[in-house]
Amino acid sequence: MANIKSAKKRAIQSEKRRQHNASRRSMTRTYLKKVIAAIASGDKAAAVAAFATAQPIMDRMATKGLIHKNKAARHKSRLSAQIKAMA
C-alpha cells in the first residue's frame, strides 16, 4: 500500500474507476448479447429493437474510451449486416 498521501488518493481513485469501468463494460456486453440472442431467435422486430438500444451505448462507450472506436464500429457493422440478412 502507498505511503504518500497523493499515492493513496490515486490508488483509491484507480480502484473506483476500475469498478465503474467494469460495470460499464459488463452493461455493454449484456446489450450485445441481447441483440445476438434476438438474431439467433429469428425475430427480426426484436433484433431491430435490441440493436437500436445497443447502438448508442456502443457509441457512448467508444467516446468515453472504454472500448476502441473501431471495435464499436465493427460490432455495429456486423450486427447490422446480420439483421439485414434475416429478411
From Swiss-Prot:
Keywords: Ribonucleoprotein, Ribosomal protein, RNA-binding, rRNA-binding
Record Pfam families: Ribosomal_S20p
A GO molecular-function descriptor: small ribosomal subunit rRNA binding
Record carries keyword S-adenosyl-L-methionine: no
Gene3D superfamilies reported for this sequence: Ribosomal protein S20
Record-level GO BP terms: translation
Residue ranges, annotated region (Disordered): 1-27
GO cellular component: cytosol; small ribosomal subunit
Cysteine disulfide partners in this protein: none
InterPro entries, sorted: Ribosomal_bS20, Ribosomal_bS20_sf
Protein's job: Binds directly to 16S ribosomal RNA.
Family of this protein: Belongs to the bacterial ribosomal protein bS20 family.
PANTHER family from the UniProt entry: 30S RIBOSOMAL PROTEIN S20, SMALL RIBOSOMAL SUBUNIT PROTEIN BS20C
Protein name: Small ribosomal subunit protein bS20
Species, as recorded: Aeromonas salmonicida (strain A449)
